[in-house]
């Protein structure tokens, strides 16, 4: 993807990041030795994750997601939009003034939809952009996963390896951004005080984020289950509820802040 290419480019320029070739014994050495002060593990399928971080709360949404990026005419593109369709939630997530990321979650994985059908549905519900073209579609099964324990000794799980939620309005990425901010602040604080970067940072990180991430992800799960239930009955409940809430200024102000910043308890 373009984002991956940009990250790779920045990493190559960064003198503090060293690229290494992973050998078979690499993960065993990390687990056994104390060569590094802190290790951040964001890969879900490596030996560290499988051997140490395997206790998770999981849920199969029994849904599939289609993702793509659309190119469109230039516009002020600074608002994420979530539409609850009869097939499932459709999210328009700003990427730039000429590109928007699309995430379409089909509620029933048994109802196979072709790329052509998904494209037609996106065009049908799009009221915001003059679309010029679609990039390649990606399709994946949706599953919820959140770790019970965030760290082991000096190893911290991070990103999708830490929590993977339903892509309602792109909130999974927002959760990771908030985690990055909290972890970065904790590291800066230790450095400013001249204290070592050790596992105490990971303990503090878990203490500051675990309850918020769980509450937040549970809220996303509730919204998903509600609209899945509501979808079976012709969206009668959601139409009335959203119609009422749409007129409530206080609710709209809070929900916008919640979407941008998440929980702040």
Name the predicted role of every residue range.
Residues 110-199:
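FAD/FMN-dependent oxidoreductases across multiple families
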Residues 1-9, 109-116, 142, 230:
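Short beta-strand to alpha-helix junction loop
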Residues 3-4, 8, 63, 119, ...:
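A general structural signal for well-ordered alpha-helical segments in protein cores
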Residues 14-15, 152, 248:
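Acidic-histidine catalytic/liganding microenvironments
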Residues 1-69:
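Conserved N-terminal helical subregion
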Residues 185-265:
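C-terminal helical "tail/cap" subdomain of flavin- and related membrane-associated enzymes
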Residues 10-13, 72, 186-190:
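Active-site catalytic microenvironments for nucleophilic, acid-base chemistry
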Residues 42-129, 134-137:
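Conserved FAD-binding catalytic core of PHBH/FMO-like flavoproteins
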């Amino acid at each position: 993807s373009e984002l991956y290419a940009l990250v790779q480019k920045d990493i190559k320029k960064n003198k503090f990041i060293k690229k290494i070739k992973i050998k078979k014994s690499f993960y065993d050495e990390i687990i056994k030795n104390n060569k590094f002060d802190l290790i951040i593990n964001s890969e879900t399928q490596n030996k560290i994750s499988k051997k140490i971080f395997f206790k998770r709360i999981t849920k199969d949404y029994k849904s599939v997601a289609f993702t793509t990026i659309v190119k469109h005419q230039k516009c002020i593109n600074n608002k994420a939009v979530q539409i609850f369709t009869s097939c499932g939630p459709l999210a328009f997530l700003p990427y730039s003034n000429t590109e928007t990321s699309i995430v379409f979650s089909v509620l029933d994985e048994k109802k196979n939809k072709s790329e052509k059908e998904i494209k037609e549905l996106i065009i049908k519900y799009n009221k915001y952009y003059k679309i010029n073209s679609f990039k390649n579609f990606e399709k994946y099964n949706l599953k919820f996963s959140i770790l019970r324990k965030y760290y082991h000794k000096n190893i911290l799980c991070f990103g999708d390896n830490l929590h993977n939620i339903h892509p309602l309005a792109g909130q999974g990425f927002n959760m990771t951004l908030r985690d990055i901010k909290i972890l970065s602040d904790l590291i800066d604080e230790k450095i400013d005080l001249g204290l070592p970067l050790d596992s105490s940072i990971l303990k503090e990180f878990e203490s500051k984020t675990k309850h918020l991430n769980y509450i937040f992800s549970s809220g996303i799960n509730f919204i998903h289950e509600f609209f899945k239930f509501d979808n079976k009955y012709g969206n009668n409940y959601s139409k009335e509820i959203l119609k009422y809430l749409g007129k409530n200024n206080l609710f709209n102000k809070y929900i916008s802040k919640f979407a941008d910043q998440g929980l702040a308890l």
